[in-house]
Amino acid sequence: MHTGCCTTKFDTEVLIIGNGPAGIALSSFLSGMHPFYDATHPHENVTVHEKLLANHDFSLIDQDLSWSSNLTELSQSGRPLSVLYDMLVRPGADMGSDAPGCIQWELNRRREIPHMVIGETKIGGSWNEYDAEMLTVSFSDWMDMPGFTMEQWLGGRPLVKRLPSVAIATYLKKYVERLRLRKKFHQYFVVNSIKKIGDVWVTSGKRSTDGRSFVIRSKQVVVACGKTSPRKLQLPNEEHCSSNIVYDVRALKERLDATKKTVIDEDENYDTPSTSTCSPVIVVGDGVSSVDCVRHCLERDIPVVHVIRRTLRELRNVMLSRLSPIHYSEYTDIYRMMIGRSVHKNYQRVLDASITSVSKIHVEITTGSNREIIEMPYSTVAVCIGRESHFSTVFENAHTFLDYQSEQDETLFAVGAYAGDHFVRFLVGGCLRVAQHITGAANNNNVTAKLLPIC
């Protein structure tokens, strides 16, 4: 890379910031991995089949797929191409069908567009940070990257639908190696600034491994980093009590292990007391992450007070309510407790509630229409109210994105969670759309033309 004040060429044509599933999928598309409609496996939707059959000699990247926004079953999501891609690679997936996909993959290195992928972590992004034993919410085949599936990597269909997060992190690394993308990926790059100077994006920051600065110049930038920063309670005393507050199940496990009391009995006749007599863990939130924390505590006989912002009526419509007890029994069991359908000696819920004050020994929970205040002692507070991205602060100007492209600058894009696609099964379609934008621009311009220096 060039770090001087003046250079005769850019570091790369396209800079992808984020080395998780979104960055990996987009890198694959830009490296020449292209999807073609497989006419031998026609899709059951007649309109989709006829539209794609008419251009089946062209990859989806080279086709105008704007017609997809006119199909009701695709447009309702607001991301028609994401849904179209998903229904082509996994037809009938939501109905439990194992029908073969309608896509053939071809790797054409001559179509490669020069690009770099940088990330703050190891390849795989936030999948490296999750609790290794945590099972994915998505089924294993919903995690497939373009052209090399989870099933191909495993050497056969897995015996279970959901795999632990460590398997997903490993698959993503192996995928990058299998497609020979490794040289494009640069780990532990922390971005501090992104500026547009003329027609050039200048991205700068430091490497977390050695503190060395970097500067990358590119014609286009794609923000592919997820929402990695946990949302906090935003209470005045929260930072002062940070040693007692965690934001995911992995950190909760580590804290409980660190504070666990060991009873030493020389005569070996002393029964270890149940941990249910200690102050409870207070879990805040009503999503999957909060349920992971509740479940871990109950499995260890630790009392839990579950603080839920929603009312009972609202709680009946959350994502957890739609999970199948066949495949997600660990979540549906806790969900039944959340809505009062079942009870557990160590579980207490507080609905229509929020934590309004925290000290090192107790919290204040405000609940109900009359805003009753409950003072509750605690051992640990697990705050699981979602994640957010602070990445927008690195830009000089604010950007809004439509169809994955900045409305303020057509050379800036966003994919993955940053663009609102939170599940891998849908974010790959978003990457396909950005690949269309970038490939179309490359076809309309001389990519190899000499570029002016930045001074």
From Swiss-Prot:
UniProt note: phenotype after gene disruption: RNAi-mediated knockdown causes abnormal binucleation of primordial germ cells (PGCs).
Keyword list (alphabetical) reads:
FAD, Flavoprotein, Monooxygenase, NADP, Oxidoreductase
**Any idea of its EC number?**
1.14.13.-
UniProt keyword annotation of Flavoprotein present: yes
InterPro entries on file: FAD/NAD-bd_sf, OKL38_fam
Q: What class of enzyme is it?
A: oxidoreductase
Q: Which SUPFAM superfamilies match?
A: FAD/NAD(P)-binding domain (SSF51905)
The cofactor note from the UniProt entry for this protein is: No monooxygenase catalytic activity in the absence of NADPH.
Query: Which cofactors are named for this entry?
Result: NADPH
Localization terms from the record: Midbody
Role, per record: Monooxygenase catalytic activity. Involved in regulation of cytokinesis; promotes rho-1/RhoA activity, probably acting locally at the midbody in late cytokinesis. Monooxygenase activity is required to stabilize structures between primordial germ cells (PGCs), termed intercellular bridges. Dispensable for fertility.
Q: Which family does it belong to?
A: Belongs to the OKL38 family.
What is the protein's given name? Oxidative stress induced growth inhibitor homolog osgn-1
The scientific name of the source species is Caenorhabditis elegans
